[in-house]
């Protein structure tokens, strides 16, 4: 019988007590003991404990417990661990012994890293025992902190991925128990755990990292506060953890996965790091946060929502590297869960970055969105994908080509999903249309587009049937532009196929024909085909090389590719074979690759036609009538350009022709009309009665069917339909009396006249007589006109319109139109209809019928003018122009739409565009925005085609070379039909409408861009003289049709010349004698000079040219293409309010004109009235000259400030003294503050917009004014005269000397000051200005301005020539006056036509500047020759922001007066203040100051004392956040601006956009008069049209309180 374990242990204890000498005997005893101990249960009876007590005592003997052999130590550890298990919960030994035991047990754990070792199993048992029975808690009771630390360190060091799960869980449980049972988490334990966290660490195993995360996850409530404290301390730079070498970013990542609640207080610190100035910090935290949000299955907590939002805002970071990193993480974020809750926010942020200024960012955004869309087609909204597609128009070829590739890939994926039956895959059939639009892009052209359509658009294994289904949907979604591009591609392919077939045919017969003649034909064919390639000259050379090839296989393959019977599969295979024959190294490889696509039927083949016809039948049988129309339309288009594809489809076409479905029948007729000549033989074989079927449709079908049936009948017969049409024609004429078929019969008669004129002429007289007497002279029933609408025309009216169309078609045959006679009779009919609305004045009909007939007659004139323009009398031309006067808006829209269409298609002379000017509604001309756009489009189109016209003209002085050639026709029409007799009628109001019409057309001719700006000064110099010459030529001519109207024409020309002077704000500079241009001889002839009259013909002064009359016209509210100008007869306050209503500013010129208009109106009533010195209500007239002078003085004061800031004028003591005087002055006038005028804010550009809105009205702020400012203001205020005559005289002088100049391409207000003025010191100016107190109040908008003042000093010609394209790539410094400092940037490009440089600043801002008018310095030429700017060499850069307090070098303000600042929002285009550096400023100071301020580049938000946002008080943002937001948003608007510059060549000026303005409301009291200073300011200051509304309001506010007249 075996001994019991306790008995064995008793014996073993006795043996151990004797201390065995050998190691082996000791190991044997310990092994036996371990086995016995494992067999005992926990908490055995006392007898058992007593029995094993000898062993318990023996095993802890020092010589055993402290044995040095590792095997002995392991067995001892195994035994004592079992002993602790058995005696639990009581400790088997004393505290000191237990410490030694746990030290032994912990040392045993160190061997767990050897999984394959013989002792691994025993160590695992020890680990399990300790974990299961929680004996490790005793270590805490014994305060074995070092031992506990060793446990943590050991476990994390020995953890392996190949450990059994029991080992991992046991270690995890032990560590959790030690943490949970401890009163406080020891810092070193936490650091041990955190030190193992982090991604991609080579020094830490994944198992250890996973173990640490599991422990933290289970102990999160216990360790949360300590972790939070550690992280906050580490992120705030606490030196206590600086030596821990723990990367808290990596810790945060793992904590977010295992214990996100521990990060609750970390969010603000992460947000702060996202806004840090240091790039490395931002990049690191971006990487962390990006990976956190990319974790799959994670929902962003509320705590991290603020971090997420700021993370998205980093997409606007000024550093490209940061933005690129965020895009990568956003991509991972969306791919992990495309439908996550934050997807819409992410996508919205991505859309904004599609307009980033960096092309690599834009490309990456496209990549991100397309990658996400490919993974889940419905994850990205269609509207977002269409925004991505707009990058096909990107200015960078890198972006547009990449976008093309990704959209093509996306469409392929979409096709595959559709083929798999996944119906919920979104709609991407619009993508091919966007690709087709790129046909007009010079970087793509047809070569790229055709390759994509043929080879890349659909999956390679896609069946023809699937392709057909998609093509039908694609085609049905095309808009006009896409349809036109698609037709263009098909047309080019047809031309190349025809020319290649002709070339191959000639090549086969070359041996038998005349070689030179053949060569000539071949070269001509090559030239024709080359035009369809992207590089025609190179292509033509490649054709010549191809012609020399002797390889018969190449020619055989090309012949097969041109065969329409070759299937798509065969064509693709033989094309590949041809390219293999050549190999990629061959010079013709790329050329033949493109040619084989263009001349083959890879795009559409006969297989397509058969599948489409089958699809029609399927939809017909399924009663899907809506799906039939796009199929028939698609077939009709293929029939136009690929008629050979319908060979073999005759049977289906005949069945469709016989079908009752009208859409199928009409579509088939169109196909037969286009492709009938190709398939006529097969048609006759299949159905000999097809011509009879077509004849029946001609009579019984509707008008459209009848039209196609006639053309089909002519197409399918061999003699061009002469025989068939003769029979049909006879039958139709005989049926004219049958009212049932009259519409179709008239249609057929017109078509026959166009196709077969000999047939039509056989009975033409009968047809014409019938239409004239039996149709056009029909009387309509009397109807109440008041109840009729445009659609209520009578059947008789409709029949008359059909008759007119038939007569018109008879004079527009397809061949030999000029051989027709008798068009005068038709024109006579049209004249009567245009005049009376009927063919005879005696005929009565409703106003609706007359309107319809007038419209039909006008459209007929437009069509006839293509061939008969020289036969159309001037009177009919005038009547046609007046068609928009029809009192039905629909009639105007239809007619003007036709004019626009015909002129754009080059089938109508531009002179008919005059009709737009006769669209008069009330007192407005061309009120419809659509019609305005169309007229502008016509003018733009005419400018674009002018070069081609010039090359075709022989008369260089011909006015028809220019778009302006419509002016003679317009003047003639106005003189005859709108203008009263100028010698009899002296009522100015009768000429107001003529002035409006002229103003509109001239402004559009001069300002031909959509925003009303002339492209550049050079072009204005070309256009203005041309228009002036036209008017002068008319004045020197005589009316051909009615000499009595000549005076009217001359008077209208006077108005036109005054409008030009008004728009250009300068007298025309016509060098030499005026050379008349060639005017239309049908309108004007040179005037005969009377003998003895020495005056030049046509130069006599007419009363309409009188200045007072012109002032009346200029006071009108005029609508032009550029702007809405002067508001008539309104008070000053109304003028200002109206100017603010649209958020724009009113330029100086316009306000002066308004004041002039008021003056002419009110002067009469005020002559005899005495006026008080001041009018507090501000209802009197304003001294305009006074205001102009004050504005000029404001500029002078700004220059004084600028000089002072340069250190030129005042010492610190002097500046302090002036500052004190200013403060005193301000304090005295505090109680006199008046209301502050709100200024409309200005967007950066017309296309961009800011998501951040600021209040329009800023708070009231007191500004300090320098003494010289106050004195200068005093001078001007003192100069007001109380005499009404004197004041009127002053106003008149001002109006003559100050002309508000319309800016053409400048954002700056310009002020010219002589060098002597610049040299004046502040003290001298103060002395000359005199004394007095002044009050200066100012309110700023929400953002500061950058003012531009040019001409501060004369520059040499040599200096002017230094700015050119050689600066590209150089680094320069550009002066920002309102910031009082330079900013560094790189010159990226130069537009020589506009003399504009594109500057990329270091912070990412982009600005387009004319450096010749800027203050700048060259820093680094990049190896190029250094050039200087217009500035002086000794310029100082030591400057401070205007309005801010002076600071010491340490940044402490000198003045303790507390002020608040207006926060800067998004940087807008500022007015450029161009300032010369004073020569005597030490440059070292400026460089030192530059270094100090380089850290604060973005702190340029206020050039005025600080104020708070109204409505947003207390809102604070960190500096970095403000920087990134502003710059990121600027990036978007810069790209919009650059794309507009490239595609539309437009640039905003201050007249078209609203700008932020600074208010200067100053009121002066008791100032002394100083005429000398006033004259100096008046002579050297030039007011600008870019003066803002705010500044003008302030001046008005100062002046209206004083007496005027």
Swiss-Prot record:
A motif (Nuclear localization signal 1) lies at residues 1226-1233. One of its GO terms (cellular component) is mitochondrion. Residues 1425-1442, 1464-1476 have a biased composition (Basic residues). It comes from the Eukaryota. Residues 1575-1585 have a biased composition (Acidic residues). It is found in: Nucleus. Residues 1155-1182, 1203-1262, 1279-1307, 1324-1353, 1423-1605 are annotated as: Disordered. Disruption phenotype: Weak impact on meiosis such as formation of some chromosome bridges at late anaphase I and telophase I in forming pollen, but severe effects on development, fertility, somatic homologous recombination (HR) and DNA repair, especially in plants lacking PDS5A, PDS5B, PDS5C, PDS5D and PDS5E. Keywords: Cell cycle, Cell division, DNA damage, DNA repair, Mitosis, Nucleus, Phosphoprotein, Repeat. It holds the Pfam family PDS5. A motif (Nuclear localization signal 2) lies at residues 1426-1433. InterPro entries: ARM-like (IPR011989), ARM-type_fold (IPR016024), Pds5 (IPR039776). Its main location: nucleus. Gene3D superfamilies: 2.30.30.140, Leucine-rich Repeat Variant. HEAT repeats lie at residues 50-89, 96-136, 146-183, 184-221, 261-298, 302-339, 341-378, 380-416, 552-591, 644-681, 723-758, 821-860, 961-1000, 1050-1088. One of its GO terms (biological process) is microsporogenesis. Residues 1211-1225, 1279-1295, 1477-1495, 1514-1527, 1534-1574 have a biased composition (Basic and acidic residues). Cohesin cofactor dispensable during the meiotic division but playing an important role in DNA repair by homologous recombination (HR) probably by helping SMC5/SMC6 complex. Regulator of sister chromatid cohesion in mitosis which may stabilize cohesin complex association with chromatin. May couple sister chromatid cohesion during mitosis to DNA replication. Cohesion ensures that chromosome partitioning is accurate in both meiotic and mitotic cells and plays an important role in DNA repair. Belongs to the PDS5 family. Interacts with the cohesin complex. Interacts with DEK3. This is Sister chromatid cohesion protein PDS5 homolog A. It comes from Arabidopsis thaliana. The gene is PDS5A.
